Amino acid sequence: MYKNRRNSLINHLPKNSALIIPGADLQYRNADSSYNLRQESSFYYFSGFCEPSSLMVLVNNGSSIDSIIFVPEKDKLKEIWDGYRAGPEGAVKDFLFDQAFENHKSDNLVPEILQGLDKVFYSIGKKSGFDQKVIDWTCAANSKDRHSRSIDIIDGSSLVGNLRLIKDDYEIETMKKACDISAQSFVEVMKSIKPGDNEQEIEALFLYEFAKRGGRFPAYTPIVAGGEGACVLHYIENDKELKNTDLILVDAGCEYKMYASDIT
């Protein structure tokens, strides 16, 4: 599925051009305590790969090698702490990329990949600090090939977005499942609410009901607002005790296989 999506994207690239899609990095709550990784949506859509600090480069230049991924290196010690890493070999074998390299090699190898191309597509402004890296890679590629015209950097958001706009059968069923999980969870939580409950208890019930049905994470921070809190559009304190006469507004939805649901 992911390889077919990549092939479709490559076929939509102009000849002699490339598309760069960076994955998400780990974000840290404090010290060495990180949040759960939520992979960048477009990166996951075309790769199926869910390790941090990865990078995908797709190329349309007539070569047999047109899908390249940079991934975290294999590291036995870090895998003891943080879990399995596919490494370059696993990225080729299990995710069907033509080539894969350790991500620390990207600064040297990406300019070589881009050398001689006419255009580089990249979604400008989506990942803080990464824009300059793409500019640096492109400048390095230009300096390696002074006899060719300079490479243009073009915003790739529309190119990627248009291919993702129309959902296939798998996506539609996945979206339906996400909505079903959330709808069933709403019903179960409504059965449990009583005066004296705290809003955070109700939030916890939603997270439990989502997870029990396969929605490991919420799609966004749930809003559980009793009484006047419901007048605050993005109320997320979720810490007040519910009175007997309170009405409760809940805005919550699970994420299932990277697809969100949203019910108020």
Predicted regions and their residues:
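A composition/biophysics-driven feature that prefers long, compositionally simple stretches
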Residues: 1-184
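Active-site pocket-lining segments that scaffold enzyme catalytic pockets across diverse folds
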Residues: 167-214, 220
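Short, well-ordered alpha-helical packing segments
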Residues: 10, 17, 26, 176, ...
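Secondary-structure boundary elements
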Residues: 15, 61, 113-115, 181-184, ...
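A broad detector of the eukaryotic-type serine/threonine protein kinase catalytic domain
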Residues: 161-164, 187-191, 228-229
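Short catalytic-site patches enriched in acidic/histidine residues
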Residues: 31-37, 143-144, 154-159, 197-264
